[in-house]
Amino acid sequence: MTDTEHPTTEANRRASTPQEIDIAAVSDVVESVVANVETVMVGHHDAIEHIMTALLGRGHVLLEDVPGVGKTMLARAVATSFDGTFKRVQFTPDLLPSDVTGVNVFNQQTREFEFRPGPIFANVVLGDEINRAPPKTQSALLEAMEEAQATVDGETHEMPAPFTVIATQNTVEGDRAYDLPMAEVDRFMKKLHLGYPEEDDEVDMLGRVVGRHPIEDLQPVISLEDLRMARAATADVTVETPVREYATRLVTYTREHAQLGVSPRGNIDLLRAGQARAVLDGREYVIPDDVQAEAQHVLAHRIRTGGERDGQEVVSEALERVRVE
Protein backbone atom coordinates (compact mmCIF):
# COMPACT_ATOMS: atom_id res chain seq x y z
CA MET A 1 0.00 0.00 0.00
CA THR A 2 1.20 3.51 -0.76
CA ASP A 3 0.32 7.10 -0.02
CA THR A 4 -0.13 7.95 -3.70
CA GLU A 5 -3.25 9.24 -5.40
CA HIS A 6 -5.76 6.63 -6.47
CA PRO A 7 -8.22 6.97 -9.36
CA THR A 8 -11.70 8.00 -8.29
CA THR A 9 -14.00 4.99 -8.16
CA GLU A 10 -17.72 4.78 -8.73
CA ALA A 11 -18.57 5.43 -5.09
CA ASN A 12 -16.90 8.82 -5.33
CA ARG A 13 -18.37 9.63 -8.73
CA ARG A 14 -21.89 9.04 -7.46
CA ALA A 15 -21.56 11.06 -4.29
CA SER A 16 -19.93 14.21 -2.99
CA THR A 17 -20.88 13.71 0.68
CA PRO A 18 -21.27 10.58 2.83
CA GLN A 19 -25.01 11.13 3.17
CA GLU A 20 -25.44 10.99 -0.62
CA ILE A 21 -23.51 7.77 -1.19
CA ASP A 22 -25.42 5.14 -3.11
CA ILE A 23 -25.47 1.96 -1.00
CA ALA A 24 -25.30 -0.11 -4.18
CA ALA A 25 -22.14 1.73 -5.23
CA VAL A 26 -20.53 1.05 -1.86
CA SER A 27 -21.51 -2.60 -2.18
CA ASP A 28 -19.80 -2.67 -5.59
CA VAL A 29 -16.63 -1.22 -4.08
CA VAL A 30 -16.60 -3.87 -1.37
CA GLU A 31 -17.11 -6.64 -3.89
CA SER A 32 -14.12 -5.34 -5.86
CA VAL A 33 -11.95 -5.72 -2.75
CA VAL A 34 -13.29 -9.22 -2.11
CA ALA A 35 -12.54 -10.24 -5.69
CA ASN A 36 -9.05 -8.74 -5.44
CA VAL A 37 -8.21 -10.63 -2.26
CA GLU A 38 -9.57 -13.87 -3.73
CA THR A 39 -6.83 -13.77 -6.37
CA VAL A 40 -4.47 -14.49 -3.46
CA MET A 41 -6.66 -16.36 -0.95
CA VAL A 42 -8.52 -19.26 -2.55
CA GLY A 43 -11.53 -20.79 -0.82
CA HIS A 44 -11.99 -18.19 1.92
CA HIS A 45 -14.78 -16.03 0.51
CA ASP A 46 -16.77 -15.94 3.75
CA ALA A 47 -13.75 -14.93 5.84
CA ILE A 48 -12.90 -12.14 3.41
CA GLU A 49 -16.46 -10.84 3.55
CA HIS A 50 -16.39 -10.92 7.34
CA ILE A 51 -13.21 -8.85 7.37
CA MET A 52 -14.84 -6.36 5.02
CA THR A 53 -17.90 -5.98 7.24
CA ALA A 54 -15.56 -5.32 10.17
CA LEU A 55 -13.73 -2.65 8.18
CA LEU A 56 -16.99 -1.00 7.14
CA GLY A 57 -18.21 -1.15 10.75
CA ARG A 58 -15.03 0.56 12.01
CA GLY A 59 -13.91 -2.57 13.81
CA HIS A 60 -10.76 -4.63 14.31
CA VAL A 61 -10.29 -8.32 13.44
CA LEU A 62 -8.53 -11.20 15.20
CA LEU A 63 -7.60 -14.18 13.01
CA GLU A 64 -6.97 -17.31 15.06
CA ASP A 65 -5.97 -20.71 13.72
CA VAL A 66 -3.17 -23.23 13.39
CA PRO A 67 0.04 -22.10 11.66
CA GLY A 68 0.25 -22.17 7.89
CA VAL A 69 -3.39 -21.67 6.86
CA GLY A 70 -2.86 -18.17 5.48
CA LYS A 71 -3.78 -15.79 8.31
CA THR A 72 -0.94 -13.37 7.61
CA MET A 73 -1.39 -13.62 3.85
CA LEU A 74 -5.09 -12.82 4.15
CA ALA A 75 -4.38 -9.78 6.29
CA ARG A 76 -1.71 -8.57 3.85
CA ALA A 77 -3.99 -9.06 0.85
CA VAL A 78 -6.83 -7.09 2.44
CA ALA A 79 -4.48 -4.30 3.50
CA THR A 80 -2.84 -4.13 0.07
CA SER A 81 -6.25 -3.68 -1.57
CA PHE A 82 -6.48 -0.20 -0.02
CA ASP A 83 -4.37 2.68 -1.24
CA GLY A 84 -3.17 3.76 2.19
CA THR A 85 -0.38 3.06 4.64
CA PHE A 86 0.24 -0.48 5.86
CA LYS A 87 2.55 -1.56 8.68
CA ARG A 88 3.33 -4.96 10.10
CA VAL A 89 4.32 -5.66 13.71
CA GLN A 90 5.86 -9.07 14.36
CA PHE A 91 5.04 -9.76 18.01
CA THR A 92 7.80 -11.59 19.89
CA PRO A 93 8.51 -12.26 23.59
CA ASP A 94 11.13 -9.46 23.70
CA LEU A 95 9.00 -6.81 21.96
CA LEU A 96 8.55 -3.64 24.05
CA PRO A 97 5.49 -1.34 24.13
CA SER A 98 7.63 1.47 22.72
CA ASP A 99 8.47 -0.76 19.74
CA VAL A 100 4.77 -0.58 18.89
CA THR A 101 3.75 2.96 19.79
CA GLY A 102 6.99 4.85 19.19
CA VAL A 103 9.39 6.91 21.31
CA ASN A 104 10.50 10.47 21.96
CA VAL A 105 14.06 11.04 20.75
CA PHE A 106 16.24 14.02 21.69
CA ASN A 107 17.28 16.09 18.67
CA GLN A 108 20.78 17.46 19.21
CA GLN A 109 20.27 20.26 16.68
CA THR A 110 16.96 21.63 17.95
CA ARG A 111 17.66 20.67 21.59
CA GLU A 112 14.13 19.30 21.77
CA PHE A 113 12.52 15.89 21.97
CA GLU A 114 10.87 14.67 18.77
CA PHE A 115 8.32 11.90 18.51
CA ARG A 116 9.22 9.00 16.26
CA PRO A 117 5.98 7.10 15.61
CA GLY A 118 5.98 3.34 15.82
CA PRO A 119 4.39 0.95 13.33
CA ILE A 120 0.97 1.32 14.98
CA PHE A 121 0.61 4.62 13.09
CA ALA A 122 -0.81 3.33 9.81
CA ASN A 123 -4.20 2.96 8.16
CA VAL A 124 -4.03 -0.83 8.39
CA VAL A 125 -1.83 -2.48 11.01
CA LEU A 126 -1.06 -6.19 10.92
CA GLY A 127 -0.24 -7.51 14.38
CA ASP A 128 1.32 -10.86 13.55
CA GLU A 129 1.30 -13.64 16.17
CA ILE A 130 0.05 -11.21 18.77
CA ASN A 131 -0.14 -13.86 21.49
CA ARG A 132 3.65 -14.34 21.45
CA ALA A 133 4.21 -10.97 23.15
CA PRO A 134 3.78 -10.45 26.92
CA PRO A 135 0.63 -8.73 28.20
CA LYS A 136 2.41 -5.40 28.81
CA THR A 137 3.31 -5.16 25.13
CA GLN A 138 -0.12 -6.33 24.01
CA SER A 139 -1.63 -3.55 26.11
CA ALA A 140 0.08 -1.00 23.88
CA LEU A 141 -2.71 -1.69 21.40
CA LEU A 142 -5.61 -1.00 23.77
CA GLU A 143 -5.76 2.79 23.56
CA ALA A 144 -5.12 2.76 19.82
CA MET A 145 -7.87 0.23 19.13
CA GLU A 146 -10.47 1.96 21.29
CA GLU A 147 -9.71 5.64 20.76
CA ALA A 148 -7.54 5.74 17.60
CA GLN A 149 -4.74 7.43 19.50
CA ALA A 150 -1.60 6.58 21.47
CA THR A 151 -0.20 8.36 24.51
CA VAL A 152 3.59 8.43 24.77
CA ASP A 153 5.30 10.25 27.65
CA GLY A 154 2.10 12.10 28.43
CA GLU A 155 1.52 13.34 24.89
CA THR A 156 -1.39 12.06 22.81
CA HIS A 157 -0.86 11.29 19.13
CA GLU A 158 -3.76 10.64 16.77
CA MET A 159 -3.85 7.64 14.46
CA PRO A 160 -4.36 8.21 10.74
CA ALA A 161 -7.95 7.83 9.59
CA PRO A 162 -9.19 5.28 8.82
CA PHE A 163 -7.39 3.02 11.29
CA THR A 164 -7.84 -0.74 11.58
CA VAL A 165 -5.93 -3.52 13.32
CA ILE A 166 -5.90 -7.02 11.86
CA ALA A 167 -4.17 -9.36 14.31
CA THR A 168 -3.26 -13.03 14.04
CA GLN A 169 -2.60 -15.63 16.69
CA ASN A 170 -1.72 -19.30 16.54
CA THR A 171 -3.59 -21.88 18.59
CA VAL A 172 -0.71 -24.32 19.14
CA GLU A 173 2.03 -22.11 20.59
CA GLY A 174 1.94 -23.81 24.01
CA ASP A 175 4.32 -22.37 26.59
CA ARG A 176 5.57 -19.73 24.16
CA ALA A 177 2.18 -18.00 24.01
CA TYR A 178 0.37 -15.58 26.29
CA ASP A 179 -3.38 -15.41 26.69
CA LEU A 180 -4.84 -12.17 25.40
CA PRO A 181 -6.36 -10.13 28.25
CA MET A 182 -10.13 -9.85 28.07
CA ALA A 183 -9.87 -6.07 27.77
CA GLU A 184 -7.99 -6.60 24.50
CA VAL A 185 -10.16 -9.44 23.22
CA ASP A 186 -13.25 -7.28 23.70
CA ARG A 187 -11.79 -4.59 21.45
CA PHE A 188 -11.79 -6.89 18.45
CA MET A 189 -15.10 -6.62 16.63
CA LYS A 190 -14.63 -10.11 15.20
CA LYS A 191 -12.67 -13.26 15.75
CA LEU A 192 -12.35 -15.48 12.68
CA HIS A 193 -11.07 -19.01 12.08
CA LEU A 194 -9.90 -19.87 8.56
CA GLY A 195 -9.61 -23.64 8.77
CA TYR A 196 -8.00 -25.82 6.13
CA PRO A 197 -9.04 -25.26 2.50
CA GLU A 198 -11.11 -27.76 0.57
CA GLU A 199 -9.03 -30.19 -1.49
CA ASP A 200 -9.91 -28.57 -4.84
CA ASP A 201 -9.17 -25.11 -3.45
CA GLU A 202 -5.82 -26.28 -2.12
CA VAL A 203 -4.87 -27.72 -5.50
CA ASP A 204 -5.87 -24.41 -7.10
CA MET A 205 -3.82 -22.52 -4.52
CA LEU A 206 -0.74 -24.63 -5.21
CA GLY A 207 -0.98 -23.82 -8.90
CA ARG A 208 -0.95 -20.11 -8.11
CA VAL A 209 1.90 -19.96 -5.60
CA VAL A 210 4.44 -22.55 -6.78
CA GLY A 211 6.08 -19.90 -8.95
CA ARG A 212 5.71 -16.18 -8.30
CA HIS A 213 3.29 -15.58 -5.43
CA PRO A 214 0.25 -13.51 -6.50
CA ILE A 215 0.59 -11.25 -3.42
CA GLU A 216 3.67 -9.76 -5.08
CA ASP A 217 1.56 -8.42 -7.94
CA LEU A 218 -1.52 -7.43 -5.96
CA GLN A 219 -2.57 -3.81 -6.49
CA PRO A 220 -4.93 -1.47 -4.60
CA VAL A 221 -8.46 -1.39 -6.00
CA ILE A 222 -10.00 1.34 -3.84
CA SER A 223 -8.69 4.56 -2.33
CA LEU A 224 -8.73 5.68 1.27
CA GLU A 225 -11.45 8.16 0.36
CA ASP A 226 -13.55 5.26 -0.94
CA LEU A 227 -13.12 3.49 2.39
CA ARG A 228 -13.96 6.63 4.37
CA MET A 229 -17.13 7.16 2.35
CA ALA A 230 -18.07 3.49 2.60
CA ARG A 231 -17.73 3.68 6.38
CA ALA A 232 -19.80 6.86 6.50
CA ALA A 233 -22.51 5.24 4.38
CA THR A 234 -22.50 2.17 6.62
CA ALA A 235 -22.93 4.33 9.72
CA ASP A 236 -26.03 5.88 8.08
CA VAL A 237 -27.74 2.50 7.56
CA THR A 238 -31.01 2.47 9.50
CA VAL A 239 -31.34 0.25 12.58
CA GLU A 240 -34.96 0.25 13.76
CA THR A 241 -35.95 -0.26 17.39
CA PRO A 242 -37.14 -3.89 16.95
CA VAL A 243 -33.71 -4.84 15.57
CA ARG A 244 -31.93 -3.07 18.44
CA GLU A 245 -34.20 -4.88 20.89
CA TYR A 246 -33.50 -8.24 19.24
CA ALA A 247 -29.73 -7.71 19.40
CA THR A 248 -30.00 -6.72 23.05
CA ARG A 249 -32.03 -9.84 23.89
CA LEU A 250 -29.31 -11.98 22.28
CA VAL A 251 -26.64 -10.23 24.33
CA THR A 252 -28.70 -10.49 27.51
CA TYR A 253 -29.05 -14.25 26.94
CA THR A 254 -25.25 -14.61 26.92
CA ARG A 255 -25.01 -12.74 30.23
CA GLU A 256 -27.60 -14.99 31.84
CA HIS A 257 -26.12 -18.26 30.57
CA ALA A 258 -22.36 -17.77 30.91
CA GLN A 259 -19.84 -16.82 33.56
CA LEU A 260 -18.99 -13.72 31.53
CA GLY A 261 -21.38 -12.52 28.85
CA VAL A 262 -21.13 -10.00 26.05
CA SER A 263 -20.35 -6.41 27.00
CA PRO A 264 -22.25 -3.33 25.78
CA ARG A 265 -19.30 -2.75 23.44
CA GLY A 266 -20.02 -6.15 21.92
CA ASN A 267 -23.67 -5.18 21.41
CA ILE A 268 -22.58 -2.02 19.59
CA ASP A 269 -20.20 -4.04 17.42
CA LEU A 270 -22.99 -6.50 16.60
CA LEU A 271 -25.21 -3.74 15.23
CA ARG A 272 -22.34 -2.08 13.36
CA ALA A 273 -21.49 -5.41 11.75
CA GLY A 274 -25.19 -5.81 10.94
CA GLN A 275 -25.15 -2.42 9.21
CA ALA A 276 -22.18 -3.52 7.12
CA ARG A 277 -23.90 -6.81 6.26
CA ALA A 278 -26.91 -4.82 5.04
CA VAL A 279 -24.61 -2.75 2.81
CA LEU A 280 -23.14 -5.91 1.30
CA ASP A 281 -26.68 -7.00 0.48
CA GLY A 282 -27.49 -3.61 -1.04
CA ARG A 283 -29.89 -2.49 1.70
CA GLU A 284 -30.13 0.78 3.62
CA TYR A 285 -31.66 -0.87 6.68
CA VAL A 286 -30.74 -3.73 9.01
CA ILE A 287 -32.93 -6.81 9.36
CA PRO A 288 -32.66 -9.61 11.97
CA ASP A 289 -30.98 -11.83 9.38
CA ASP A 290 -28.03 -9.41 9.33
CA VAL A 291 -27.66 -9.66 13.09
CA GLN A 292 -27.87 -13.45 12.95
CA ALA A 293 -25.27 -13.65 10.18
CA GLU A 294 -22.76 -11.70 12.26
CA ALA A 295 -23.56 -12.96 15.76
CA GLN A 296 -21.12 -15.88 16.04
CA HIS A 297 -18.07 -13.96 14.86
CA VAL A 298 -18.88 -10.83 16.87
CA LEU A 299 -20.09 -12.35 20.14
CA ALA A 300 -18.55 -15.78 20.78
CA HIS A 301 -14.98 -14.67 21.59
CA ARG A 302 -16.26 -12.32 24.30
CA ILE A 303 -17.97 -15.09 26.29
CA ARG A 304 -16.41 -17.10 29.13
CA THR A 305 -18.42 -20.08 30.35
CA GLY A 306 -16.23 -21.48 33.12
CA GLY A 307 -17.18 -24.99 32.01
CA GLU A 308 -17.04 -27.39 29.09
CA ARG A 309 -19.18 -25.26 26.79
CA ASP A 310 -17.62 -22.55 24.69
CA GLY A 311 -18.84 -19.18 23.49
CA GLN A 312 -20.01 -20.52 20.14
CA GLU A 313 -22.39 -22.93 21.84
CA VAL A 314 -23.86 -20.13 23.95
CA VAL A 315 -24.39 -17.95 20.87
CA SER A 316 -25.97 -20.87 18.99
CA GLU A 317 -28.39 -21.38 21.89
CA ALA A 318 -29.22 -17.68 21.93
CA LEU A 319 -29.93 -17.64 18.19
CA GLU A 320 -32.16 -20.69 18.59
CA ARG A 321 -34.09 -19.61 21.68
CA VAL A 322 -34.35 -15.82 21.40
CA ARG A 323 -37.30 -14.97 19.21
CA VAL A 324 -37.51 -12.23 16.61
CA GLU A 325 -40.47 -10.04 17.55
Provide a role label for each language-model segment:
Residues 55-93:
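Walker A/P-loop
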Residues 88-120, 176-184:
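Conserved AAA+ P-loop NTPase core
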Residues 23-61, 66:
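Pre-Walker A (pre-P-loop) alpha-helix and adjacent loop at the N terminus of AAA/AAA+ ATPase modules
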Residues 9, 23-27, 177, 194-260, ...:
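Conserved C-terminal "switch" segment of AAA+ ATPases
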Residues 10-20, 256-325:
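C-terminal engagement/docking regions of AAA+ P-loop ATPases
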Residues 65, 128-129, 140:
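Walker B catalytic acidic pair
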Residues 51-53, 106-126, 130, 155:
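Conserved alpha-helical scaffold flanking the Walker A/P-loop in AAA+ ATPase domains
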Residues 107-112, 133-137, 146-221, 230-236, ...:
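Canonical AAA+ ATPase core
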